[in-house]
Swiss-Prot record:
Keywords: Cytoplasm, Isomerase, Manganese, Metal-binding. This is Phosphopentomutase. Pathway: Carbohydrate degradation; 2-deoxy-D-ribose 1-phosphate degradation; D-glyceraldehyde 3-phosphate and acetaldehyde from 2-deoxy-alpha-D-ribose 1-phosphate: step 1/2. One of its GO terms (molecular function) is phosphopentomutase activity. InterPro entries: Alkaline_phosphatase_core_sf, DeoB, Metalloenzyme, Phosphopentomutase_DeoB_cap_sf. It comes from Shewanella denitrificans (strain OS217 / ATCC BAA-1090 / DSM 15013). The keyword Acetylation does not apply. Mn(2+) 2 binds at residues 303, 308, 356. It is an enzyme of class 5 (isomerase). Belongs to the phosphopentomutase family.
């Protein structure tokens, strides 16, 4: 029986990519800089001491970080018996965004440029917003700028509730984000508005429209809910997920995976929100998985709750929670299963600003007859997609080199 389980630690980069200079990200290292802050006592909120990830270390995380950066992250060393295959991957895709990282990992790099809203203020063309408002029957909107999602709620959340006008904002990524109060504006109204925006954004080549529902009564208690929805464009060609589905296999999305792939190549969608619920749902789907199945989970909290918010202690605590639960998952693996742990980009919480960082990602693989030891530098995330194709004996992907023979 052949099954693959993919754990996407969203934003968990392990050192600046080879082309990080083009992005202003030389020195970025999500894993290493979190470990350094922990070792220096700068991440002792809700936790304390060095970064403790013994199970990830056994899968080769520390060694992959060493190969990527030339040094072991504080608290990690070569004196660990590694049981898995480990490596690190550079990104071929032109951007450091979520769809690019996910699609490339599944064998389809994004070799074209996304559209972006580069102006920090008055970010959106009036022609675009006029069309969206007219179709939605709205009189106006708030925002129209680059912003942190939490900060803009503090600044404009109350005005949004008073006026009924949605909050439109963007970032350095190819995104159009819409924040609305889940109760006063209505979740269904927000989702319909985002569907309209997705349709109108076609000519602008924007990768995602993101619905950002929130609740609360004022700036002190506004909080996002778990009903986020991503409206992505479809990948430019078939991913390994599509190929397995087309061959009669099953592809189970846990969390926001289905949204990222525009629901292409997915046979089952499991909704879950929050690190604990995502891990619980992953375990349940592994227990149910039959032959020729992929279970693919995105652990978005690392990125959305801690990376973008530059919360080093929160990120470290979340990683330690994830690590503590790994043995539950490992106990469910069967002899021929393939487990992959990776990331889609970096989001170094010690880095200036609030955007993603251009980083290499870990490639931690266990099972499928792989020998423990180094996989070295992978020149594309697509090596993972090609390896999955090899594992399931599917038609080869156009990009990537398999590390499974």
């Amino acid at each position: 029986m052949k099954r693959t389980f993919i754990l996407m630690l969203d934003s968990f980069g392990i050192g600046a990519a080879s082309d990080a200079d083009k992005f202003g990200d030389i020195g970025a290292d999500t894993f290493g800089n979190i470990a350094k802050a922990c070792a220096e006592g700068k991440a002792n909120i809700g936790r304390d001491g060095s970064l403790k990830l013994p199970n990830l270390a056994k899968l080769g995380l520390g060694h992959a970080g060493f190969e990527s950066t030339g040094q072991f992250a504080p608290g990690f060393s070569q004196d660990v018996e590694v049981v898995g295959a480990y490596g690190y991957a550079d990104e071929l895709s032109t951007g450091k965004d979520t769809p690019s990282g996910h699609w490339e990992m599944a064998g389809v790099p994004v070799l074209y440029d996304w559209g972006y809203f580069n102006d920090l203020q008055d970010s959106f063309p009036k022609e675009l917003t006029d069309k969206i408002l007219a179709r939605a029957g709205l009189s106006g909107f708030l925002g129209n700028c680059h912003a942190s999602g939490t900060t803009i709620l503090e600044q404009l959340g109350e005005e949004h509730m008073r006026s009924g006008m949605p909050i439109f904002y963007t970032s350095a990524d190819s995104v159009f984000q819409v924040a609305c109060h889940e109760e006063s504006f209505g979740l269904d109204n927000l989702l319909r508005l985002c569907e309209i925006a997705r349709e109108e954004l076609g000519p602008y080549n924007i990768g995602r429209v993101i619905a950002r529902p929130f609740i609360g009564t004022g700036p002190s208690d506004f909080s996002r809910t778990g009903n986020r929805r991503d409206y992505a464009v479809e990948p430019p060609s078939k991913t390994v997920l599509d190929k397995l589905k087309d061959a009669g296999g099953e592809v189970v999305s846990v969390g926001k995976i289905a949204d990222i792939y525009a629901h292409c190549g997915i046979t089952k969608k499991v909704k879950a929100s929050g690190l604990e619920a995502l891990f619980d749902a992953t375990l349940e789907q592994i227990k149910q998985a039959g032959d020729r199945t992929i279970v693919f989970t995105n652990f978005v909290d690392f990125d959305s709750h801690y990376g973008h918010r530059r919360d080093v202690a929160g990120y470290a605590k979340a990683l330690e929670y994830f690590d503590e639960r790994l043995p539950e998952l490992l106990a469910l693996l069967e002899q021929d299963d393939l487990l992959l742990l990776t990331a889609d980009h970096g989001c170094d919480p010690t880095w200036p600003g609030s955007d993603h960082t251009r980083e290499r990602v870990p490639v931690l693989a266990l099972g499928a007859g792989l020998a423990a030891g180094s996989l070295g530098l992978r020149n594309s995330f697509a090596d993972m997609g090609q390896s999955i194709a090899s594992y399931f004996e599917l038609e080869p992907m156009e990009y990537g080199e398999s590390f499974i023979q």
